[in-house]
Swiss-Prot record:
One of its GO terms (molecular function) is DNA N-glycosylase activity. CDD domains: ENDO3c, NUDIX_DNA_Glycosylase_C-MutY. Residues 1-23 have a biased composition (Basic residues). The active site is at 105 (proton donor/acceptor). This is Adenine DNA glycosylase. The record marks 207 as: Transition state stabilizer. Transmembrane segments: none annotated. A motif (Nudix box) lies at residues 376-398. Involved in oxidative DNA damage repair. Initiates repair of A*oxoG to C*G by removing the inappropriately paired adenine base from the DNA backbone. Possesses both adenine and 2-OH-A DNA glycosylase activities. It comes from Rattus norvegicus (Rat). The gene is Mutyh. PANTHER family: ADENINE DNA GLYCOSYLASE (PTHR42944:SF1).
Length: 516
């Protein structure tokens, strides 16, 4: 039992994952290199000495010009109508324009465009300027961000807004270098996107979509997360960016990767740069090689074992995959598995509807500052989960209910690095009247208040299980597992107080009125 830890009080503090929009680890949002000096410069010089075949480069300026022209022409006709693009186009104030780009880029990290649109619209309506965001509470930020995932993004965005307002005179840094230097949570990609789109700085960007486009047009099959390939991709992006329309070019490259040059089933026949694509040429080469007298097609001049950009000899070209051979995905560790028991505690509300108990997570670590149902972390075996959960509930105290602890089902939620399985329970408190004082770190909410509170997607899944069960639509076991204090034999000294569990009342408290 010593290994059973109450997650609401002592959950292992691990930083939330900050992966960018499908982006490989080419640049960390935590890193702040303003230039290449010392060891970084030496390492880059060594990398630059590594031979690279022209096959993986844009050696002909005519190809660069054609790539820019074709891509921008396609973008002008096919670009999606997105709210942040409209706002940037209409906004004349440079700081507000940069803020609009900044918010969109942070929200789009590892999140689909369709999901972001509604969040972005509500965010900009609530906080249209950096000053508005800087004056908001973290609770309000978490509340609006609820369900978007990677919650530290919202917190870092607000930290950046406050720094701009309080330390930089309300002016957003104008270059990618200073953006990355001065603003928390702004890495190389985000800095380049803001600088090029808002300020027209001629600087390239590399995110997951751009990686895919560049790897295919130049047949780069090596691991895109390696230092050598990373440097090469950033160099290509900088070489290709259009000096007259850098922001549009970068958005066009990302748009191409998102809508045409997709991870699976790319629409090559609709690609504006198909004629310049080495991967597409490689597919054609395979078809022609079966014909007599087929012409030679350009290939990498280096031996595959020597070239650090070609497909590795251990994982060569697969004709069945076509252009999807590029880029090859780096191997990922599976998320570690964790287990938790969580309980939806309810009592009658003043208006007749039920109130449910939420407690706040620590201010650092996974899901920092968000609200959740009382929960405990379990051993993989799941043994003693009832007892552990009752101990956690006892922490919040009130008279012992006659209703048993009831098992409702199981919820599985996968974070970027954790697969968390929740065993969901409910507990009904009878005849309780909320008091007038607030117990720190806890609140009673109505169902409607819960839906608008700063809670994670995992807790929303838990609530749905509880809601379905309460409405009689849950398709769980006909004989749900239950545990009551009276069912335990010879309770320990620490458990003897369960007959007074929930001794102090926890009052109703609206989500936006809790102090941090």
């Amino acid at each position: 039992m010593k290994k059973l830890r109450a997650s609401v009080r002592s959950h292992k503090k691990q930083p939330a994952n900050h992966k960018r929009r499908g982006k490989c680890a080419l640049s960390s949002s935590q890193a702040k290199p303003s230039g290449l000096d010392g060891l970084a410069k030496q390492k880059r010089e060594e990398l630059l000495k590594t031979p690279v075949s022209p096959y993986h480069l844009f050696s002909d300026i005519a190809d660069v010009t054609a790539f820019r022209r074709n891509l921008l022409s396609w973008y002008d006709q096919e670009k999606r109508d997105l709210p942040w693009r409209k706002r940037v186009k209409e906004e004349t104030n440079l700081d507000r324009r940069a803020y609009a780009v900044w918010v969109s880029e942070v929200m789009l990290q590892q999140t689909q465009v369709a999901t972001v649109i509604d969040y972005y619209t509500r965010w900009m309506q609530k906080w249209p300027t950096l000053q508005d965001l800087a004056s908001a509470s973290l609770e309000e930020v978490n509340q609006l961000w609820s369900g978007l995932g990677y919650y530290s993004r919202g917190r870092r965005l607000q930290e950046g807004a406050r720094k701009v307002v309080e330390e930089l005179g309300g002016h957003v840094p104008r270059t990618a270098e200073t953006l990355q230097q001065l603003l928390p949570g702004v890495g190389r990609y985000t800095a380049g996107a803001i600088a090029s789109i808002a300020f027209d700085q001629v600087t390239g960007v590399v995110d997951g979509n751009v990686i895919r486009v560049l790897c295919r047009v130049r047949a780069i099959g090596a691991d895109p997360t390696s230092s050598f390939v990373s440097h090469h991709l950033w160099d290509l992006a900088q070489q290709l960016v259009d000096p007259a329309r850098p922001g549009d070019f970068n958005q066009a490259a990302m748009e191409l990767g998102a809508t045409v040059c997709t991870p699976q089933r790319p629409l090559c026949n609709h690609c504006p740069v198909q004629s310049l694509c080495r991967a597409h040429q490689r597919v054609g080469q395979g078809r022609l090689s079966a014909l007599p007298g087929s012409p030679d097609i350009e290939e990498c001049a280096l031996n595959t074992r020597q070239c650090q950009l070609c497909l590795p000899s251990t994982n060569p070209w697969d004709p069945n995959m076509g252009v999807v051979n590029f880029p090859r995905k780096a191997s990922r560790r599976p998320p570690r598995e964790e287990y938790s028991a969580t309980c939806v505690v309810e009592q009658p509300g003043a208006t007749g509807g039920p109130l449910i108990l939420l407690v706040q997570r620590p201010n650092s670590g996974l899901l920092a500052g968000l609200w959740e149902f009382p929960s405990v972390t379990l051993e993989p075996s799941g043994q003693h989960q009832h007892k552990a959960l009752l101990q956690e509930l006892q922490h919040w105290s009130a008279p012992l209910p006659t209703t048993p602890l009831q098992h409702l089902g199981e919820v599985i939620h996968v974070f970027s690095h954790i697969k968390l399985t929740y065993q969901v329970y409910s507990l009904a408190l009878e005849g309780q009247t909320p008091a007038s004082t607030t117990l720190p770190g806890a609140r009673w909410l109505t169902w409607e208040e819960f839906r608008n509170a700063a809670v994670s997607t995992a807790m929303k899944k838990v609530f749905r299980v509880y809601e379905e069960h309460r409405r009689g639509t849950c398709k769980g076991s006909k004989r749900p597992q239950v545990c009551t204090p009276s069912s335990r034999k010879k309770p320990s000294r620490g458990q003897q107080v369960l007959d007074r569990f929930f001794q102090r009342h926890i009052p109703t408290h609206k989500p936006n009125s809790t102090t941090q």
